[in-house]
Amino acid sequence: HYLHINSRGDVEPCIFVHFAVDNVKEKPLREILQSPFFKAIRARQPLDPNLLRPCMIIDHPEVLREICSEHHPYPTCEGAKTLVADLSEGLDEYAKEVARVLDPAWEKDFVAKGFVPKYID
């Protein structure tokens, strides 16, 4: 439930996810947020019940690849495409390791203590 607008006006889903389908210099932000691209991202949130793993780059790289495949955003910086191409295998392995560490931490430090996340619709 956030976004980033870079200095060129490209509206990205996150400061670290350098992909966009629209630019605020060409379209109102309200319209951009209702685009199929942003709707697809919101439909997948939270990406995981474990709120320690909210990122579509580090924690759930498959989601970033799916969204890019479905909506064909343009990269907003040089090298952005490597996240959904060249680095896919390494990111998938890293995500598995992150889950191996953070899932038990989530269970122990949050679920076991009765924490129930309140999701924003």
PLM regions with names:
Residues H1:
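Structured beta-strand/loop patches that form or line metal/cofactor-binding pockets in enzymes
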Residues I5-N6:
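Short, acidic, Ser/Thr-enriched surface-loop or helix-capping motifs
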Residues F16-D121:
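Flexible mid-to-C-terminal extensions adjoining Fe-S/redox cofactors in radical SAM and related proteins
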